[in-house]
Amino acid sequence: MGHIDLTAVNADLGRNAPALVQWALGLGKTSIVTTNFRPFEAVILHMVTQVNPKVPVVWMDNGYNTEATYRFADEVTKQLGLNLKIYLPLRPRAHREAVEGPTPALNDPRHAAFTAEVKLEPFARALRETAPEVWFTALRATDT
């Protein structure tokens, strides 16, 4: 497939999210949906799995999620039959904290290395291993 005219696609499908999902999955490209299992994430997970329940759902579980997040992840995974692929840091939380202490504060110079280890490396590994050509996410304008 050559060039995709996204302006034309957006003009045709507009804000019809289910139609956009159908169109994107209809391209026949390797697809993933990423999630952090915030409450509103269920919407995009539901939309994508309604079109193709086999799409890999990639979750970077940094080991620092709340009990509510883990319960929500389990509930949504079961209800939607998600093809969940969990990516964890290479070093477990208990090991990291035993050697380096608790999570460094945002203004602590060690925080950059912490972020690289528990968030960025698992994310980069997930993208390498899944090699998506179509990527769904519920990123909001207020997210960073």
What kind of region is each of these model predictions?
Residues 1-144:
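ATP-dependent adenylation/nucleotidyltransferase module used to activate substrates
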